[in-house]
Amino acid sequence: LAKENDVEADIVVPVPDSGNAAALGFAQHLKMNYEHGLIRNHYVGRTFIEPSQKIRSLGVKLKLNANQTTIKNKKIILIDDSLVRGTTSYKIVKMLYDAGAKEVHVKIACPEIKYPDFYGVDTPTKKELLAANKSNDEICEYIGAKSLKFLSLNGLYKAIGFENRNQTYPQLTDHYFTGDYPVEPIDELGDNKITQLSLLSLSLIHI
């Protein structure tokens, strides 16, 4: 993420606790100041898995508070591990500006999440995934940031020790970024679903 950075700023601020590790590594690599510009209440759970938008928005307000002394009149690089619906990012960016930040540049330590993870817990449908429905510029405008950049797919692989992604046999289950599911999700195939189910039935008969 740091190697792909193209923004100059005063401080690096993580979204606690999800962005802590990425923000620390980012700041160390670029020799920037790492600051806790957001203070987290650890007695409030993860907001993106709450059942409704209203509750998620309230959860952000209860969970995080801006450290005005740290961020006032500063150009900030705000780092989080992911951006799903955009609820948390929008609220946090607004919170930082309300506390006096001069600029807020958002960096996400993974590629755009464009596809549901059917192997996950309470994963949103595709229509709820912000990156599946908006361009980078549109997402940036939606969350109110000065700029927005996601880690590239190859950048993700390089960050954990691979030279590049193996296009034929990916080293990771990265289907939520690429749509390249290990097993094609039948209920998402539309008109092709009946054909797929028929083939599955024939396969089972011959087992």
PLM feature segments, named:
Residues 1-204:
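PRPP-associated nucleotide enzymes
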